[in-house]
């Protein structure tokens, strides 16, 4: 195995929605026939040890521990069996989301998934790492909140990379987030969130409260609704105190 720095200036960060079977079951959702994706802006990137910032007025800041594929060379229109040749390596990521904006940003996910500090990534990249049969865990203050295995993935990283490349040219340094297992929940300022992946390492970030709030008087504001709660709180119906609806996945 060989390690190298993670490029912190990718042209794009592509994230898959549902991929792990436990996450699909948690939502009572149907697995789509093909992967669906959203983008995070590079400005959301932070390193291990740097704080994830929750704006004032927001309550539903969720973690999602993930494995991240780092593109090593330009690719377009490749086949899944060839995708490994275009991967520089893998690392650990945390696909944080501000679900308080889900009611207004459900289409683009811009503020939900792309706000500042919503994309912690571990350095370095590990090349020669085999993604099959690997454990992934997310811990909050030392307590395991997510625990899964890459064998749960419906589409492995090579499939995802090839699929994305059918319509988007992937460039060196681009990041592909490959999905999260069940157990994503909100965290609070003062919490410490760690993501561990067998053979890749441990990504750790503290959660802090922003000194600034979302300016009022214009633009969308953080909100709370059954849709927000159903996404942020997953299967915790008793905690939410509401009758479970049929939630939309992520």
Give the positions of each predicted feature.
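Short, conserved beta-strand element in jelly-roll/cupin
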Residues: 38, 68-73, 121, 161-162
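RNA pseudouridine synthases
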Residues: 64-94
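Short helix/loop capping segments that flank catalytic or ligand/cofactor-binding pockets
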Residues: 24, 48, 78-80, 100-102
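Extended, compositionally biased flexible segments
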Residues: 1-59, 63, 228-230, 237-246
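Catalytic-pocket segment enriched in acidic/His residues
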Residues: 1-5, 23, 99-250
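Short catalytic-site patches enriched in acidic/histidine residues
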Residues: 36-54, 76, 117-124, 182-185
């Amino acid at each position: 195995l060989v390690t190298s720095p993670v490029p912190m200036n990718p042209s794009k960060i592509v994230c898959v929605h549902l991929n792990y079977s436990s996450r699909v079951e948690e939502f009572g959702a149907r697995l789509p026939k093909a992967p669906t994706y959203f983008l995070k802006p590079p400005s959301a990137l932070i390193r291990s040890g740097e704080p994830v910032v929750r704006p004032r007025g927001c309550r539903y800041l969720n973690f999602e521990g993930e494995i991240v594929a780092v593109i090593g060379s330009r690719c377009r229109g490749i086949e899944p069996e060839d995708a490994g040749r275009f991967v520089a390596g893998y690392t650990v990521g945390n696909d944080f989301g501000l679900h308080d904006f889900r009611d207004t940003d459900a289409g683009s996910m811009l503020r939900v998934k792309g706000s500042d500090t919503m994309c912690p990534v571990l350095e370095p990249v590990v090349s020669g790492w085999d993604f099959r049969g690997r454990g992934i865990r997310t811990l909050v203050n030392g307590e395991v909140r997510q625990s899964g295995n890459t064998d749960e993935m419906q589409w492995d990283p090579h499939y995802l990379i090839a699929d994305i490349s059918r319509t988007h040219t992937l460039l060196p340094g681009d990041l592909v987030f490959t999905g999260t297992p069940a157990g994503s929940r909100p965290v609070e300022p003062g919490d410490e969130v760690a993501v561990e992946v067998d053979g890749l390492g441990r990504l750790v970030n503290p959660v802090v409260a922003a000194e600034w709030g979302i300016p009022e008087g214009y633009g969308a504001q953080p909100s709370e609704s059954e849709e927000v709660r159903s996404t942020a709180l997953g299967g915790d119906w008793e905690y939410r105190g509401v009758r479970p609806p049929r939630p939309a996945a992520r």
